[in-house]
Regions:
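Membrane-embedded alpha-helical segments and adjacent helix-loop junctions characteristic
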Residues: 25-88, 148-219
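Cytosolic, long alpha-helical scaffolding segments
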Residues: 97, 123-127, 254, 258, ...
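Small-residue-rich segments of transmembrane alpha-helices in multi-pass membrane proteins
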Residues: 138, 159-171, 269-278
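Transmembrane helix-loop junctions at the membrane interface of multipass transporters and ion channels
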Residues: 9-24, 114-128, 144-146, 176, ...
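Membrane-interfacial helix-loop connectors
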Residues: 75-80, 84-112, 117-139, 206-243, ...
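Juxtamembrane helix-loop transition segments at the membrane interface in multi-pass membrane proteins
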Residues: 44-57, 91-100, 178-184, 218-224, ...
Length: 612
């Protein structure tokens, strides 16, 4: 409702401004070019983010000072603390960093955003910046026309900087032209009232433009043109700092509880920093005068003094809040808790994660592991095995002769509660992420899609297998009980082996171990088929029992095969970007069948097709 009212209102105001004043055209065009330049730079930096994010994060955020530095450097490069905040929320939602690390990055981003004020005040207003914009645009477009993704990324960055420079130029001209017709300082509000009113204006302007950097640039150019008093400009800078948290809050709406906690930490930091700046405005002004004099800033150079003030109160905010990061983490974790839901929901997927392909891939990889953990319980219970038994070290062969202990479970109900929503969300997320990602991510997203589909197929095979297994594994016929217990042992063994593979850091070893499991599984299939043939020939089971064993043997092969495919796909999806997926290390299906044949004698007709 608010959006439907706000957009037409903005169009009406802008249209009237364009009709009433040519200077307003320059000013509005400057803001538009500046914001568009920021969008172009964001697009360019996203291209360079792929493939190195997790390695950079692990090396750059393992200590608090590194997290702060990461925030400072990334915001200085991107010139957008809002973008850094949203990306950090996506990192946290995907569990690529912890909450304390995320808070450190946010604090650093607030320091990094002060560099924008220095660039505009110290460079943008003192040289003919439009002269630099044109070559940047020309070279940027030239790079954009290349086929290489890296060149395109560089092109977006150069074009973005060019539009930023043009935006500053038009804003400066717009305010200079206004000075000939109207003195905006007549609307200045002195004292505490002025501080509060212009702080609010700064918040609103930042929310509307979704950029504190744009608000500060507008403030500095107005101050340089004499259209804004120094005191009111300080209040606008404070408001811009507080207003930038709105973008982080919006970015956290689709995030999990960790992302929401980080957005809350961002809000707390900026609110505290803004409150301290307002309360201590007089002492801060004295500090600004002292620092300005010490570094040689002229007494009437209010634009550079504004940059000093902006840096000073952000530094004070960081100094005040850093000692309380752990306290803040504890408070946020105790007061912001995930909702208790009847149906399990995705934990790691968020809209913010879609901004960067590698973050999106990591998020859906973790969500697929979450789905598999839920499916693990359903499958184990579906074949009457306790999770603790499967994950333990007891010899599962001991289960062959004893009647199964029934586990009461409604697979349809548990599927709806624990699997369905996560599976649907994963498939949708993969489709959206793959559509926006470069081609080099396609194989890994495809592997994750296959893993999700195989998990669901394994659960469905379990449901079919359970119908007879639930009867025969505890029945009086010892032959049928033993063979159905053999199905249970085979499923439990594969679940246990896959659990061990997840602890294996060496991907090559994991792939070779997976081939070993496949060989053992096919060998067990061959052996089971021979036993069924023997039981039929000797008349120890009825034809109806034999049919059940044959059909349920097929379901067991389907179930085990799907689980092994899931394991393989997850190994491929976890392969670091830029490395080979390791297909050359794996045995082909014919090789596996030949090895199994050598272990168990001549293969039965059709066994290889069954395995496939």
């Amino acid at each position: 409702m608010l959006g439907r009212i706000a957009l037409p209102s903005i169009f009406i105001v802008l249209s009237y401004g364009f009709w009433a004043s040519s200077s307003f055209k320059d000013l509005a065009a400057g803001v538009a070019l500046f914001l568009f330049g920021m969008l172009c730079m964001e697009q360019g930096f996203k291209v360079f983010s792929g493939g190195t994010i997790q390695r950079v994060l692990s090396a750059s955020t393992d200590k608090l000072w590194k997290s702060l530095s990461f925030g400072v450097v990334s915001t200085t490069l991107m010139q957008s603390s809002s973008l850094v905040s949203v990306i950090t929320i996506s990192f946290l939602s995907a569990e690529m960093i912890g909450l304390a690390q995320g808070i450190g990055i946010i604090f650093g981003a607030n320091l990094g955003t002060t560099t924008g004020a220095w660039i505009v005040a110290g460079f943008g207003l003192k040289v003919n910046i439009s002269a630099y914009a044109m070559p940047l645009l020309v070279f940027g477009v030239l790079f954009l026309m290349q086929s290489s993704a890296r060149f395109k990324g560089l092109g977006w960055i150069l074009v973005g900087i060019g539009f930023l420079f043009l935006g500053i130029y038009f804003m400066k001209n717009g305010f200079s032209a206004y000075a000939q017709y109207i003195d905006l300082t007549q609307y200045a509000i002195p004292g505490i009232k002025g501080l509060l009113v212009f702080t609010l204006i700064g918040i609103v302007a930042t929310v509307v433009m979704q950029s504190s950097h744009a608000t500060l640039t507008l403030t500095i150019t107005a101050l340089a043109a004499g259209q804004l008093t120094y005191e009111n400009a300080l209040a606008l800078a404070i408001g811009a700092n507080v207003g930038t948290t709105i973008t982080a809050i919006l970015g956290s709406i689709s995030a999990n509880i960790s992302g929401k906690r980080l957005a809350a930490a961002h809000l707390i930091f900026n609110m505290v920093t803004g409150a301290v700046a307002l309360v201590m405005i007089k002492p801060l002004l004295h500090c600004v005068e002292f620092i300005s004099g010490a570094v040689g800033i002229a007494a009437d150079d209010y634009t550079l003094k504004l940059a000093v003030f902006h840096t000073l109160f952000n530094v004070i905010g960081v100094v005040l809040m850093v000692p309380f990061i752990n306290t803040m983490v504890s408070w946020l974790e105790s007061h912001l808790k995930g909702a208790s839901v009847e149906y399990d929901q995705p934990r790691y997927l968020s809209e913010a994660s879609l901004e960067l392909p590698e973050v999106a891939q990591q998020a859906v990889y973790k969500e697929t592991l979450h789905l598999f953990d839920n499916a693990f319980s359903l499958i184990a219970h579906g074949v009457d095995l306790r999770r603790s038994l499967v994950r333990g070290d007891q010899d599962l062969q001991e289960l062959l002769e004893a009647p199964a202990q029934p586990i009461k479970i409604d697979l349809d109900d548990q599927y709806t509660r624990m699997v369905k929503d996560i599976y649907s969300a994963n498939i949708e997320f993969i489709s959206r992420a793959q559509a926006a990602a470069p081609s080099e991510f396609a194989e890994r997203f495809a592997a994750l899609r296959r893993a999700n589909m195989d998990i669901v197929a394994a659960i469905k095979a379990t449901k079919h297998l359970r119908k007879n297994l639930h009867v025969y594994s505890r029945g009086i016929d010892k032959n049928m009980r033993r063979e159905y217990n053999r199905f249970r042992v085979r499923v439990g063994s594969v679940l246990r082996e896959i659990g061990a593979l997840r602890e294996q850091d060496d991907r090559v070893v994991a792939l070779l171990s997976l081939d070993r499991i496949k060989v053992e599984t096919l060998d067990a299939d061959n052996h089971a088929s021979r036993i069924v043939d023997k039981l039929i020939r000797q008349g120890e089971i009825s034809s109806q029992m034999a049919t059940s064993l044959i059909n349920d043997g097929a379901y067991t092969r389907e179930l085990v095969g799907r689980l092994l495919d899931v394991a393989r796909d997850l190994i491929q999806a976890s392969t670091p970007h830029g490395e080979a997926l390791g297909d050359e290390m794996s045995l082909q299906i014919e090789d596996i069948a030949n090895i199994a044949r050598s272990l168990d004698g001549a293969a039965l007709p059709g066994e290889m097709e069954d395995y496939q």
